[in-house]
Amino acid sequence: MEHYISLFVKAVFIENLALSFFLGMCTFLAVSKKVTTSIGLGVAVIVVLGISVPVNNLVYHAVLAPGSLTWLGYPDADLSFLRFLTFIGVIAALVQILEMALDKFFPALYNALGIFLPLITVNCAIFGAVSFMVERNYNFGESVVYGIGAGVGWALAITLLAGIREKMKYSDVPDGLRGLGITFITVGLMALGFMSFSGISL
């Protein structure tokens, strides 16, 4: 149990996808203007990562990994070269299902997210988490914990940034730094803050 707790904490704080690896920056910077929208997108990313990482883990180990087709009589088969296409296909299907669910049950959030919801399909944070799962050879249980933890970490980062940006609307920001300029500086300072967690050994 301790292993899974430490894996979750590492995914949220120490190896934060947004602030340690700078993945998903396009959506991270574009949607982080309002806290409510950021929370909505953060929840969507948690759901997509929490499902896509373990599902892709199953697909990889059952079909794509070297020797995984032994049960079909092909012990030497290695389909790992197809993993990028397969992972993107699985992620795209899950995002499409999520998009339809939000459109039906949460139309206000669906309209607020706009084009950035389907862009989760090609969000490098999603694909990066799935790639890390393969690279680190996580089992199914670890992939579930890591997927949820990575999603929570990304959601935490975008919500914190949105809160800061809302406060900065009332600040006296120099003209040359208004907009994305001060946002980049803020993200860099947040990343420095999260870097302090790297000294924790779990």
Curated annotation (Swiss-Prot):
Parts of the chain that traverse the membrane: 11-31, 35-55, 81-101, 114-134, 144-164, 180-200
Main location: membrane
Domain of life: Bacteria
GO biological process terms on file: respiratory electron transport chain; sodium ion transport
Any Pfam family matching the protein: Rnf-Nqr
EC category name: translocase
Keywords for the protein's UniProt record, in alphabetical order: Cell inner membrane, Cell membrane, Ion transport, Membrane, NAD, Sodium, Sodium transport, Translocase, Transmembrane, Transmembrane helix, Transport, Ubiquinone
InterPro entries: NqrDE/RnfAE (IPR003667), NqrDE/RnfAE_oxidrdctase (IPR050133), NqrE (IPR010967)
Membrane topology classification: Multi-pass membrane protein
Protein's cellular compartments: Cell inner membrane
Reactions this protein catalyses: a ubiquinone + n Na(+)(in) + NADH + H(+) = a ubiquinol + n Na(+)(out) + NAD(+)
Role this protein plays: NQR complex catalyzes the reduction of ubiquinone-1 to ubiquinol by two successive reactions, coupled with the transport of Na(+) ions from the cytoplasm to the periplasm. NqrA to NqrE are probably involved in the second step, the conversion of ubisemiquinone to ubiquinol.
Matching HAMAP family: NqrE (MF_00429)
Stated name of the protein: Na(+)-translocating NADH-quinone reductase subunit E
The organism's taxonomic lineage, starting at the top: Bacteria, Pseudomonadati, Pseudomonadota, Gammaproteobacteria, Alteromonadales
